[in-house]
Amino acid sequence: MEQQAHCDEVFAGRATVTHCRGCLKCNLIQRCAIKGDDWDTLRLKILNSDVLAFASPIYFHHLTSPLKKILDRFRSFMHVQITGEGLNHTPWQEWKKHFVLLLSQGSPDAADAKPVIDLFTFLTHALGPGNSLHTIVGTRLAVSKQVAMSQDDLRSLYLKLELPAPLAEIDYERNRTLLQSCFNLGRGLAEKNGA
């Protein structure tokens, strides 16, 4: 019998999370000093998770501002020391998490997601060598649920978007592969974590 993994969904746009103020109090008290928002609840969910999956559209070459607010508060998970050569990041506790980054963007060039991937690469490394980052980028995605559209629906959409009709067939197959990659990643991580 297969076990089911427990999953908590957090919608960044609905979470009440105050912007990081850069006060650096977290360097002294080993947690974020900001009170009165959803961070304490989110923090516990993050710390108790084996897998952290982040999904975001790429808007103007970066992730959404609500998600960025949450990521900025990750600063409180580590001590940051300024040195003559740069910054040393030391997590308050050992992290061994799988970070999953699922990005969708209108651009047909996956390289346009690089700034977001670079941010998550930095974050997973700063939180310790026990972490891993798994990234999947969907390209030429302009509307909600486009990745699951039929080939005919894609053709109709592409006419409205003034995209060449032959791209619909190419993108339909690419989207099927993308969805299968997401499924395979989820299944693989669930198996690694005993679900």
Regions found by a protein language model. Name each.
Residues 1-79, 83-86, 155-195:
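N-terminal beta1-alpha1-beta2 submodule of the flavodoxin-like/Rossmannoid cofactor-binding fold
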Residues 7-9, 132-135:
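Conserved beta-strand scaffold positions in the cores of enzyme catalytic domains, especially
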Residues 59-61, 107-109, 141-142:
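Short, catalytically relevant binding-site loops at active-site mouths
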Residues 144-147, 174:
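C-terminal beta-strand edge segments of enzyme domains
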Residues 133-145:
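Beta-strand-loop-alpha "switch" segments that mediate conformational coupling across diverse proteins
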Residues 148-156:
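Short, surface-exposed amphipathic charged segments that create phosphate/polyanion-binding patches used
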